[in-house]
């Protein structure tokens, strides 16, 4: 019943209007479809996303080559396989590519088939994806890290920090956390509009006003939390995705921050100061992916007080994560399916993080689709945290709505992660 009968692929459009890959896998009694996302700020160690490069078509960003690779190589490779054996299926996909970074056939092609096969398997056994992947233990609804103010490469507004997020960890349930986030989002819109700021949104649904400094952005976020009737640090925390690899000069070992050149020591000192002035509970990619000295310094200074997330540092790669754990860099990992390219490797990375005492945050990409796989993955793995944008743009809201559906399905059996992921040894806890 779970034998794969067909694999088809097509080119579809993502939330930025760029092509991406969608695959559909059919077994004797089930079907699964999946579309892969794409990032704007990408780590240099990520699995390779294959683009056509034909400037006459989608400005070179077409994915017909990746689609063809599914139709002629990857699809035939898994025909007749048992969709219920995800590990073996992903092994075959990886072997078909044969390169260390999935550059031959494309991580976007491989992941589309991997995700679609998982969905087909779940459909075959008549289970929701989150239950199929997570089993009976899947019951934790994640605390959302909601990106309400954008900067960096996600917005042309002069801010280096890429995401200013709110973390409604004081809520009693996921539904209440989502409501809290939506209220703060709309309140921020009102504050910005009142001050004559632009209220257009960036790639991930957050506002992208032109502000004088990163600190000014944080001040707006805290004002919005308070104006919405919530207590900063008690009901709602703040998280940052600095994505500072985009603003690092490896030759001079200097960062651009607030339009000034800074050393790694100065950058870490800035974070230390901001963490004292604002209720910051998480900092992602606070220094560049290849700045090991910076990561050591940041972890030594703030690792016992704040969640330090490696995104570009680890790129959802078990080998890079293992080295990071051994070296004591960061204390959490961002999980992006398309950084590594298969469901199995993603699950392995989450398991490895847990064994090493690192938290996992399931994440979207700036170029998204209506696909809700990451919502199911967050619950399946009891990760406890999810990053999937603001309370706007249907490509972001789709994930939140799927989490609401899962919440209703779990009923009294669900647990909301709340503050738990952010409690660290040495950190001051909210009363």
Swiss-Prot record:
Catalysis performed (reactions): (2R)-2-phosphoglycerate = phosphoenolpyruvate + H2O
GO CC annotation: cell surface; extracellular region; phosphopyruvate hydratase complex
Species the sequence originates in: Sorangium cellulosum (strain So ce56)
Keywords: Cytoplasm, Glycolysis, Lyase, Magnesium, Metal-binding, Secreted
Example GO BP: glycolytic process
Family: Belongs to the enolase family.
Cofactor(s) the protein needs: Mg(2+)
Residues reported to bind (2R)-2-phosphoglycerate: 162, 336, 365-366, 387
Name of the protein: Enolase
InterPro entries: Enolase, Enolase-like_C_sf, Enolase-like_N, Enolase_C, Enolase_CS, Enolase_N
CDD domains from the UniProt entry: enolase (cd03313)
Pfam families on file: Enolase_C, Enolase_N
SMART domains listed in its UniProt record: Enolase_C (SM01192), Enolase_N (SM01193)
Active site: 204, 336
Pathway: Carbohydrate degradation; glycolysis; pyruvate from D-glyceraldehyde 3-phosphate: step 4/5
Residues that hold Mg(2+) according to the record: 241, 284, 311
Protein's cellular compartments: Cytoplasm; Secreted; Cell surface
Cofactor stoichiometry and binding remark: Binds a second Mg(2+) ion via substrate during catalysis.
NCBIfam families reported in the protein's UniProt record: eno
E.C. number: 4.2.1.11
Gene Ontology molecular function, alphabetical: magnesium ion binding; phosphopyruvate hydratase activity
Role noted for this protein: Catalyzes the reversible conversion of 2-phosphoglycerate (2-PG) into phosphoenolpyruvate (PEP). It is essential for the degradation of carbohydrates via glycolysis.
